[in-house]
Regions:
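Intrinsically disordered, glycine/charged-rich C-terminal tails and inter-domain linkers
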Residues: 132, 139-210
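Feature marks short, surface-exposed loop/turn motifs that line or immediately flank catalytic pockets
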Residues: 20-22, 108, 174
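Catalytic beta-strand-to-alpha-helix segment of the class III nucleotidyl cyclase homology domain
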Residues: 4, 41, 63-165, 169
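A generic signature of intrinsically disordered, low-complexity regions enriched in glycine/proline
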Residues: 21, 32, 190, 212-214
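Exposed boundary/loop context
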Residues: 13, 45, 52, 94, ...
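Catalytic NTP-binding/metal-coordinating core of nucleotidyl cyclase/transferase enzymes
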Residues: 2-75, 82
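Charged/polar helix/coil "stalk" or linker segments at domain boundaries
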Residues: 208-218
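Generic detection of intrinsically disordered/low-complexity segments and helix-coil linkers/edges
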Residues: 15, 30, 60, 146, ...
């Protein structure tokens, strides 16, 4: 491959991030680092089980690649369930919660790292996810829905920063079901407002025109 060629591939991207990590660190740095280490051990064990590999870490974030969408989802579900058990234990001092986003898309390989929209959308899905939750893209949903027993909640088309995508929550508990504004509903609202403005301006123009006609006739 020449230096100018871009090395691309299709990949399943898994992004996990700790909720409120900075606040935990401010409260008790040592205990938080210890708790994160234990969560990391759980995740590494599951990544090994489901054949996922970490390609980047940034502070409290973990970015991993999977060859299988089903494996990525099952890894995420098992990880959240393991964390729930850990947090319910009275022995757990610092209870860390994670958000997880999973996407399948085109990525660029560079110096052992993965870049591009495929990664960016996974990160946006992670930001969209609830604490202790998992959000996935439609590309993942279409593959895993007939092959897994988990429950999904359709969030519709979402826009986070510059990325627009169809998202789904994986419901680990019925209480996680939510309804949030979709990109299409925002467009409908904007269209409705624009239409109202046009009608209002049309009414003003019609009123002024009729008034002028009456004045001229007099």
């Amino acid at each position: 491959m020449s230096p100018n060629e871009i090395d691309r591939k299709l990949a399943v991207i898994f992004v996990a991030d700790v909720v409120g990590y900075s606040k935990h660190m401010e409260n008790d740095e040592n205990a938080t680092l210890k708790a994160y280490g234990k969560c990391e051990t759980i995740l590494n064990k599951l990544l090994n089980k489901y054949k996922g590999s970490i390609f980047n870490t940034a502070g409290d974030s973990v970015l991993a690649e999977f060859q299988s969408a089903v494996n990525a989802v099952e890894c995420a579900v098992d990880f959240q369930n393991e964390l729930k058990k850990r947090n319910e234990s009275k022995k757990t001092e610092v209870k860390l919660e994670f958000r997880i986003g999973i996407n399948m898309g085109d990525v660029v390989m560079k110096d052992g790292n993965l870049l591009g929209d495929g990664v960016n959308i996974a990160a946006r899905l992670e930001a969209l996810a609830q604490p202790n939750g998992i959000s996935i893209s439609k590309s993942i949903y279409d593959i895993v829905v007939p092959k897994t027993k988990v429950t999904f909640n359709d969030l519709g088309v979402q826009k986070v920063k510059q990325n627009t995508f169809h998202a789904y929550d994986i419901l680990l508990d019925p209480s996680q079901k939510r309804k949030i504004k979709t990109q299409s509903s925002n467009i409908t609202m904007i269209t409705g407002v624009a239409a109202a403005i046009v009608i209002l301006l049309g009414g003003i123009f019609y009123f002024n025109y009729n008034s002028q006609v009456i004045e001229n006739s007099e």
